[in-house]
Amino acid sequence: MRNAICSGLLAFAAAFVVSAHAEEAPDAMVKRVSQEVLQTIKSDPKIQSGDQARIREVMESKLAPNFDFERMTALAMGRNWRQATPEQQKRLTTEFKTLLVRTYSGALTQYRDQTIDYKPLRADPNSSDVMVRTEVVRQGQPPVQIDYGMEKKDGTWKAYDVVVGGVSLVTNYRDEFGEQVRAGGIDGLIKTLATKNGSGAK
């Protein structure tokens, strides 16, 4: 599943790198430029050889700026988000972002011949919160539906969720985070995430 997500995420991210300020529908923006960037990823020898520094550079520069990590973290935390102090919310957002980047950067080296099928956008033209639907087609394997929950803020579209085969990426963490908060409080969750990320809890 991680491989399919990476193919879709990179396709999604590519559009925003080129057209961050264009007045385009989010699905049209993705479709227009994603294939070019996916081809770049496919042919990058450093990525194909598993160069983790290069992989994370791509993730951080082309993907991360196009996601609303604060909202993603709030969704993953559920009601516990409101119990966190502003400083705790900041730490949680930072650690969750790092976790996602680390988790999915490893699958980037597995990208080969996947293609992306972009579905028509079914949303009110004036809506600021839409779902962009795509399907990752993999040779010899069943296609995987990957949808992006996106919100327009200050004229810019950003994603706040990725739904793979009907399963939300961020809310999939909710039970795990809830258990950790019950066991060790919000600071305990922060410490656990920091340990996983190798950054240590300060």
What do these predicted regions represent?
Residues 143-171:
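Short beta-strand edge/turn micro-motifs at domain boundaries
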Residues 161-202:
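Low-complexity, intrinsically disordered terminal/linker segments enriched in charged
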Residues 1-5:
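Positively charged n-region of N-terminal signal peptides that target proteins for export
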Residues 16-22:
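Sec/Tat signal peptide C-region and signal peptidase I cleavage site
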